[in-house]
Amino acid sequence: MEIPSQEIHIMIDNTISRRKERKTNLADAEPIVLMSVLSSLHAGYFRISLSLCSQALLWKIMVHLHSELPSMAYYLLWYLALATQVSLCFLYAFKCIFLFDMVKEEFSHYIGVNYLYAPSISCLLLLQSAPMIEPHSVLYQTLFWIFAVPVLTLDTKLYGQWFTTEKRFLSIMANPASQVSVIANLVAARGAAEMGWKECALCLFSLGMVHYLVIFVTLYQRLPGGNNFPTTLRPVFFLFFAAPATASLAWNSICGNFDTIAKMLFFLSLFIFISLVCRPNLLKKSIKRFNVAWWAYSFPITFLALNSVQYAQEVKDHVASVLMFIFSSMSVLIFISVMLLTAANSKRLLRRDHVLWSSTGPKDK
């Protein structure tokens, strides 16, 4: 008589080990996510804080001139700009530590190198719009030098390359983003003038304006560098009127009044703005898909609005008041629109920008 064999299956509950494995996977995933964010981040993201800081400066001036405007909006905007700037600075500092090779690659890129000025510009604007620091205080002066020294250092490196390095002539490397370096010097000049350092302000202003004229003439000739500018970055064309608008602001602070030179620079920026607005096809392809470059629409308009405010204060007629109202309203509306679009497209915000990492210069393609 045969006894039927029976198989006994023993099931071991390994939920504890699975939980440990899941925790380990999450712990391993967190550094991967951070490194992914850092690898996607570049200095062009400081366009966001640049827009916030310039908007805070506009609101500071407007609240001072028109007491009926809510001062709470200015304070909230300034603290939002501060939080954004600090966050971006920390992230970019981590990138410099962990992904320094990518930072060097960005420094070598004919477009990316210009946005290395953006953190300093944002900090200088944040300082000038600060509600609690007086321009003549020691803290203001100390922070000014901390933010201005990187600008002068980059000037020495970048401008020197244009006439000493064999493969990096301005005629080859020039592109609309090259005007960011000019804006950095002019914003620093305004900051120095606010402290009463007239000689320092004139030095920075002359440095910025000389290079602006050279860059503007180079770009006006449509040399090879401009033809290599990517379509997705065409919002950066708004820098064409941002540079003379910033120069007008700086000269107004140096002289203490909106004189003839300041008016000429304002009219130049106004003319270039109208010229760009009359050519919507130039920007049509760049707005098909969201890109962080869209923030380049915001801060140039804000600089133009700041100019219109100063112009209205000097001229005091109906046309000047209408210009101030139009550009101030336009600045706020564009700023809010871009901010809402950024929130709606947050998943696309930190995608790797293949434009900036595709080549180191026009001749490298």
Curated annotation (Swiss-Prot):
Example GO molecular function: voltage-gated monoatomic anion channel activity
Spans through the membrane: 26-46, 74-94, 107-127, 132-152, 169-189, 200-220, 236-256, 258-278, 292-312, 322-342
Covalent S-S links between cysteines: none
Presence of keyword DNA repair: no
An example Gene Ontology CC term for this record: plasma membrane
Localisation per UniProt entry: Cell membrane
Name used for this protein in its record: S-type anion channel SLAH4
Stretches of the chain found on the membrane's Extracellular side: 47-73, 128-131, 190-199, 257, 313-321
Tagged with keyword Thylakoid: no
The protein's role, per its UniProt record: Slow, weak voltage-dependent S-type anion efflux channel involved in maintenance of anion homeostasis.
Assembly and interaction partners: Homotrimer.
Any Pfam family: SLAC1
GO annotation terms (biological process): intracellular monoatomic ion homeostasis
Family as reported in the entry's similarity comment: Belongs to the SLAC1 S-type anion channel family.
Residue numbers on the Cytoplasmic membrane side: 1-25, 95-106, 153-168, 221-235, 279-291, 343-365
Bilayer topology: Multi-pass membrane protein
UniProt entry keywords in alphabetical sequence: Cell membrane, Ion transport, Membrane, Transmembrane, Transmembrane helix, Transport
InterPro entries: SLAC/SLAH, SLAC1/Mae1/Ssu1/TehA, Voltage-dep_anion_channel_sf
Organism annotation: Arabidopsis thaliana (Mouse-ear cress)
